Amino acid sequence: KYNNQERISVYVKQLDTDRVAAINDEKSMYAASVAKLGVLYYAQERLSQKKLSLSDEYQYTSAVNGFPGAYDPDGSGKISKMPDDKNYSLENLLKAVAQNSDNVATNILGYYVTNQYDKAFQKSVDKAAATSWNMDKKELTARAAGTLMEAVYRQNGDIINYLSSTDYDGERTSKNIDVPVAHKIGDAYDFKHDVAIVYADSPF
């Protein structure tokens, strides 16, 4: 069915049976904004543990765009590309990442919430994704992305709800589908990604 299969990577899991269908699902490639799922997962984990509150605020200083693994602030998103020293709530930052794929919001969360992708973050997300989640090079496999998306779904928190209403619901997995979809896209260069939970009966 798929021509030129070396240029694609597909991982599909039926969550109620654990059955998997895949093509090149262990092929590592530049994941772009799909890597932001790691930040969203970790923030939700800490929210569930009551270590964070949605009302918590973080200041947008120049430092948040300058640590290893930070996204280019000139990329996607609506928050000011230049540091404004304003405080942003955790709730608004998470919505900005999940719904607008905001690079600056990701950097603010990465700087403060994950402590610049420290060992605690890495250990937590690696365990959830069942592999090393690389926030520096942002190279991931379809299987890793799908596995972490399933973990976000299993958390059953605010994040999966935010991902169910995004700026990108008219494209990729959610395009022309009449069932709810929670998804995170990621584009860069020739890479066009999407990782999603499709709320449908099986088979779909």
Please report, for each region that a protein language model flagged, where it lies by residue.
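A short, well-structured edge-of-sheet supersecondary motif
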Residues: 1-24, 197-198
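Envelope-exposed proteins and targeting segments
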Residues: 6-8, 17-19, 54-56, 141-144, ...
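Solvent-exposed coil/turn segments that connect beta secondary-structure elements
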Residues: 15-17, 26-28, 45, 63-65, ...
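Active-site SXXK
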Residues: 18, 30-58, 97
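A short glycine/serine-rich beta->alpha loop
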Residues: 22-29, 94, 134-135
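Active-site-adjacent helix/loop patches that line small-molecule binding or acyl-intermediate pockets
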Residues: 62-63, 69-158
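Short, mixed-charge aromatic SLiMs
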Residues: 62-74, 163-176
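Short, Gly/Ser/Thr-enriched beta-strand-loop segments that form substrate-interacting elements
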Residues: 170-204
